[in-house]
Amino acid sequence: MKRLTTITLILGLFLIANAWNSSSLVADDVEGTYWNAEKTAHIRMYKAKNGFYYGKIEHLVEPSNAEGTPKKDVNNPDETLKNRASLGMVIAKAFKWDESEQKWNDGTIYNPTDGKTYDSYIYFENGNKDQLKLRGFVLGMTWLGKTSEWTRIK
């Protein structure tokens, strides 16, 4: 009987320790620098003073165009923004942490390649904090979109 109690106690402690190790994410886990999916840029995810999370291009593998001048946001549909530098551009905006869903919702992601901004949410699949998944979609329909994966730079 004493042996059964000891085994039960050890098993209970093991389950508690296992639950502790697989604890849920916290909002600031997204902060850090990532390679984009194409491995052409580093994007730094950070928490702004307003409590939302943003992503800014901090490094470009090829920062200049063929003419040797810094790359610009030439595909932007807003004529006033076409001349802004790609380096330093904020492309992920206003993501809000949702504890219950374990993801950052209600943000937008700007794709400099096509000049379009998409509704978006971001998350770590299976708690893997080295691979940030971004789901961009249109018309509020999450199934009508594309998922991209950014890799954390350590």
Predicted segments with their positions:
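A mature extracytoplasmic/lumenal domain signature
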Residues: 38, 47-49, 57-59, 124, ...
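Conserved interaction-surface patches within small, structured recognition/assembly domains
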Residues: 121, 130-135
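Central antiparallel beta-sheet cores of small beta-barrel/beta-sandwich binding domains
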Residues: 31, 42-120
